[in-house]
UniProtKB/Swiss-Prot annotation:
The gene is rpsG. It comes from Salinispora arenicola (strain CNS-205). This is Small ribosomal subunit protein uS7. Signal peptide: none annotated. Gene3D superfamilies: Ribosomal protein S7 domain. GO terms for biological process: translation. One of the primary rRNA binding proteins, it binds directly to 16S rRNA where it nucleates assembly of the head domain of the 30S subunit. Is located at the subunit interface close to the decoding center, probably blocks exit of the E-site tRNA.
Amino acid sequence: MPRKGPAPRRPLVADPVYNSPLVTQLVNKILLRGKRQLAETIVYEALEGCREKSGTDPVVTLKRAMDNVKPTLEVRSRRVGGATYQVPVEVRPARATTLGLRWLVTYARARREKTMVERLMNELLDASNGLGAAVKRREDTHKMAESNKAFAHYRW
């Protein structure tokens, strides 16, 4: 770590269509090989599809999906003596958002629909309704933290 401390977080610019930093983060997670225009098209079409299917504001749908996907606890490996313990720790808000978006995009890519727009749209709708693989991942993470609660005193 540098002597000056950690580098400051750069402010995230809100996207031009929905004026939401969360949508910008989602575009950045979808982005592959520098093709920002393609990533924006995928995200905007998926959000429009959410509007048509659910009849609500797509940013509200995205936020509700994120609330259902963001973890509050996770486990971190901690070596004590010769043993490695999975120690449950609370997740900082910025990391929770990053993990939630990462899981949404990962499990959207793994879906079986034909286009990425359909996959992302359906994963967002499932997550906003408390279903889907990303929500299951969060539940698994919480379950892991719960089962390792005995090692919570090893926190650092």
